[in-house]
Amino acid sequence: MEEGDFSGSSVRSEVTDGRNTTTTTETRTTSELQPKPLVLRLLEVQNGDEAEAVGEEGQEEDYEGSKTHKSHEVSASFRSHNSSDPPQSRKASDSLRSRKGIEPLEPRKTSDSFRSLMGSDPLQSSERQEDGKDDLFPNAVIMTSPSLIARYLPRLQLASLRAHPVTRDLVKKCFYSRKRVQDLSKPKKQWGTPDRRLFWGNQDPIRPVSEAALKAKLSKRIEDLAQPRLVSRHYVPNRIQYYYSCGRESVIWEISPPALVTRPSKRIQKLAKPNKFKAQSLIKRETVPGTTRYSDPSPRILRLSIAKGTNPSYLPPKTLETKISFSTLSAVATPRIVDLAHPRIKIEGLCYERERSELPIRPVAPAALLANPSKRTIFLAKSKRVHEDYLPIRDARWPVSYAATHSQVSERVQELANPHTRGPANLVYYDPNVFKVKPSALKAHCSDRVKELAEPIVR
């Protein structure tokens, strides 16, 4: 912005005359500290273009007359500039630097005004070089640096880009929603799945829609174009389709409709059948190098390859189904077999009748009731004695003692009850006393036997 505001004429005025630099910069800064409104600046640009176009004709004639004295005047001005006091040049450079920091922003001129300024540039330079005419020789040569004459190209403002190319009228600015653009610039979390979440603030479009567009009525042509296009049966998709998305081997081949309707000819059916090799062609066929050729089978191998016949006395395995003879099916059971076939009938779940509740289940014979047992039977009938240290089975529920209910836990028991604490796995702990040597070991002296054992074995 600041570099484009410096014109070539202002730079040349500093080179030709060091005394006038400070005055020109000061007057220019004071005039530019208060910028004019945009409409007045545009009118001044248009009026200046017309005035420069009229003044070009008069300046061309003066330029031809002053061209002969150009070399003499420039060399004189160059000498006068070298002979001038150096503090003045420093002041000019300081004023130029202050001008760069203080100079307000000016609107960029249009391309037409820039071309007109480029056309009138040499005329202005010739006029400013007429100040010194005394010190130049007739054969002097002009040497000027390109950095002093080069004009900085003005940067076009956004307002000039939005202007109409013919009328130069500014178009109304369109404001963008910065938040909406940032949301759209972010990549999607998952490819192919749109983000359907809606919350307050992301429903606004990128550009604000005007009221006229919202109230506009659609024409028949736009309604016809808004309808989706009908897909034809001859439509062929652009990308390759697959049966399964996991692999790339199962491609869906495109078969034309006439190929599905047509019938193959007899010639095609004959060619579609596999070839039948003849024995002569197999014998005459050349062997491929690298393959093994087997010899013809011997008569013994051919005889052994024939399957054996079954023996006429061979009986096949018996089937699972058992066949019952006709005599067994037609036999008649006797009454005794029928009685034995019935299950035993139990009375009240017992095999015998119970006379009284005191008597045993099974009846005892009278001889057994009158018999006298021997001493051996009486000894065996007695139960064994229980051991002195025997304790009976404890009940599932027993009372807890008073001492157990009113006991207090000691510090040692609490310490043992706590689980063993371990440090985190990401931290490595080391014991500084691992490589510590005892004082007695430092003062110890090795015996002759230990020294002998410490020496390596000589082989």
Curated annotation (Swiss-Prot):
Q: What happens when the gene is disrupted?
A: Deficient mice are viable and have normal fertility.
**Repeat keyword on record:** yes
Q: Does the keyword Ubl conjugation apply?
A: no
Where does the source fall among the domains of life?
Eukaryota
List all Acidic residues biased stretches.
47-63
Q: Where is the composition biased (Polar residues)?
A: 77-87
| Gene behind this protein | Spmap2l
Q: Where are the disulfide bridges?
A: none
Keywords on record? Repeat
Mind telling me what this protein is named?
Answer: Sperm microtubule associated protein 2-like
One family name in Pfam for this protein: THEG
Q: Where are the THEG repeats?
A: 172-190, 212-231, 258-277, 291-310, 327-346, 367-386, 403-422, 440-459
Comp. bias intervals (Basic and acidic residues): 64-73, 91-112, 127-136
Q: Where is this region: Disordered?
A: 1-138
Stretches of Low complexity bias are at: 21-30
- Per its UniProt record, what PANTHER family does this chain match? TESTICULAR HAPLOID EXPRESSED GENE PROTEIN, TESTICULAR HAPLOID EXPRESSED GENE PROTEIN-LIKE
Q: Enumerate the InterPro entries for this protein.
A: SPMAP2-like (IPR042401), THEG (IPR006623)
